[in-house]
Regions:
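Short beta-strand element of Class I
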Residues: 32
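Short Gly/charged-rich anion-binding patches and loops
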Residues: 16, 20, 66, 89, ...
Length: 123
């Protein structure tokens, strides 16, 4: 059976939130892979296996700016949704870098809704 790329890869340091996001996105009908840190696993960085959307939470990332600079080499910015966090990059900084963003405080439902909207625009 041929492996296909996931619709979404969730990158988030906190397993409860990551697990809830993954579960809700799966419930919405998406193929989802969830990981706790950047970079994403090598197989998902290969051509033909990259996710349609990368959802990345900046909370607790040691170097958020450098991480987003690396992300730009893997996926086009229009396919990335960044969850901003207090003490990391501001929403304006993320926007200037060309990424979609959603600001904390935010609910799981709001993140799932924003992810679904982005996936719909990319069809």
């Amino acid at each position: 059976m041929e492996q296909k790329p996931p619709d979404v890869i969730v990158v988030g340091p906190e397993w409860p939130e990551r697990a809830l996001l993954r579960a809700q996105l799966i419930e919405e009908g998406y193929e989802v892979v969830a990981v706790d840190q950047w970079p994403i696993p090598r197989p998902y960085r290969r051509p033909g296996m990259k996710p349609r959307v990368l959802l990345i939470d900046l909370r607790e990332l040691p170097t958020p700016r450098e991480t987003l600079d690396e992300v730009r080499f893997v996926l086009p910015t229009e396919r990335v949704l960044v969850i901003t966090a207090l003490g990391s990059l501001t929403a304006e900084e993320v926007k200037r870098l060309g990424f979609h963003f959603i600001e904390r405080p935010v609910s799981i439902g709001e993140i799932v809704g924003a992810t679904g909207a982005l996936l719909s625009r990319l069809r």
